[in-house]
Amino acid sequence: MAEQLVEAPAYARTLDRAVEYLLSCQKDEGYWWGPLLSNVTMEAEYVLLCHILDRVDRDRMEKIRRYLLHEQREDGTWALYPGGPPDLDTTIEAYVALKYIGMSRDEEPMQKALRFIQSQGGIESSRVFTRMWLALVGEYPWEKVPMVPPEIMFLGKRMPLNIYEFGSWARATVVALSIVMSRQPVFPLPERARVPELYETDVPPRRRGAKGGGGWIFDALDRALHGYQKLSVHPFRRAAEIRALDWLLERQAGDGSWGGIQPPWFYALIALKILDMTQHPAFIKGWEGLELYGVELDYGGWMFQASISPVWDTGLAVLALRAAGLPADHDRLVKAGEWLLDRQITVPGDWAVKRPNLKPGGFAFQFDNVYYPDVDDTAVVVWALNTLRLPDERRRRDAMTKGFRWIVGMQSSNGGWGAYDVDNTSDLPNHIPFCDFGEVTDPPSEDVTAHVLECFGSFGYDDAWKVIRRAVEYLKREQKPDGSWFGRWGVNYLYGTGAVVSALKAVGIDTREPYIQKALDWVEQHQNPDGGWGEDCRSYEDPAYAGKGASTPSQTAWALMALIAGGRAESEAARRGVQYLVETQRPDGGWDEPYYTGTGFPGDFYLGYTMYRHVFPTLALGRYKQAIERR
């Protein structure tokens, strides 16, 4: 006990510096927004998009060249995340982009990349999206790319493989690509930029299949679709294209994107190009909107964000600052709260297909994406608003009520919550040959469900309410044998376990329950010698990495919050975790985090949330201070 009292000034000073740093990051309008890092396919595909749309800015291309070379590793490859293994798809796309920009295959960075690509079987070993981009520029035959025809738009909402069986991100992508694949356009590369060398390999291709395994039925279906494509007459094709086009035009976001994410946005612009609609307001808005997602880098590079996270970052920052002790009516928090109120969505989106009678009230991840609010953001924002006092208290309460009711209405039949849709659990999309990329459905997840419960707990609800009781039962069913919980949207078991234990405590579950104690033991068993916690993105594919990896500030914070919620704030493990955050804090009050701790698609796409390294340690230290001072 005496030792902890000695440490108190250190963690308190660390928390004070963290608060000051977070406040310094707030934008004048009241929100927080950190760049969202991913991998270089974003920039490589941007280069090819500019070629296809005939809108190449040479200064921008040079900045992208600098960025791509900056991100290239010593062995000549690119990875999906820092410290990750070489990734063939990413390396192929970066190579093609660099050659288009003007680099020769004989330059050393290109030679290194080429040797790796050839050693893996070349283009034929790559994913569908990579081969599709190469088909668009004439470097791969369209007939070898799995087909998604626009006639998919005719499948009714109750029919297998209709577009609403796909997750929201895949749905918009499929609709846009259906138009592109219908026309199978080719925008040839200039002769100097062509890449026949990517076929120069004696290594057999190692192509992976669909996420769920294609199976002969789905392979036969794809062959049939290609056969149909070759016919001279497609009686319903034009009507299908019009339906797909109308669907896209109806769902363009206010910022010009589609879904607030890169893939459907790029493909929608290509679709509009091949439909000769480059003067259409939707195309102009979409093209101009790309600038918001670009980031100028201090060394002269330029990167493109897969998405942007201002609402998410702001909600988390408010929660962190309130936990750290800022008053509910602090002027900076009032400004943030009022900014969040303006982001509430009051029109139906795709979610209403499954919930037509549910009134809107959710929040989206981005600045302006009204058709795709998500449960995770809504839970965090409603929870954050519940910690504030604003000048217009009636408006705050009304917003919370709408958001709360929307979340309740989005509960899936198994008791959990998905991110964007209810019961988006069909397995069929995972078997389509086209779907060899990431997740294509949006089933309930442990971490989203946990954030909902912690939100509800902040209002005083507990498991006497059936909605919460069903969610708790869902979480108990999903617990892994070792005591941990999976993290769908954060890496990985540390994220899931930290969220779930905190949630169970928030809704009044006795943390002395054996299954919760097992989770806490798992957390303590995975602490690193330096006192922190870390988990490698490889844990999604190799169980040996579960809870293991170099320590990071955000993952240490998640582990600490589990221990604090579970009644172990005064444990040696918690003390050492806090000490890690104290010792690794920068002089300016922030933290460095070289590894990604966010997840887009497990096994396929990872994210570096640049605000996580600051908001989560602040939140954890604030909770630690409260727990220690209550003893």
Swiss-Prot record:
The entry describes the temperature dependence as follows: Optimum temperature is 60 degrees Celsius.
Q: Which reaction does it catalyse?
A: squalene = hop-22(29)-ene; squalene + H2O = hopan-22-ol
Q: Which UniProt keywords apply?
A: Cell membrane, Isomerase, Lyase, Membrane, Repeat
The entry's function note states: Catalyzes the cyclization of squalene to two pentacyclic triterpenes, hop-22(29)-ene and hopan-22-ol (diplopterol); hopene and hopanol are formed at a constant ratio of 5:1. Is a key enzyme of hopanoid biosynthesis; hopanoids are components of the bacterial cytoplasmic membranes that play a vital role in stabilizing the membranes.
The organism's taxonomy opens as: Bacteria, Bacillati, Bacillota, Bacilli, Bacillales
The UniProt entry's sequence similarity note says: Belongs to the terpene cyclase/mutase family.
Name assigned to this protein = Squalene--hopene cyclase
Pathway(s) served: Secondary metabolite biosynthesis; hopanoid biosynthesis
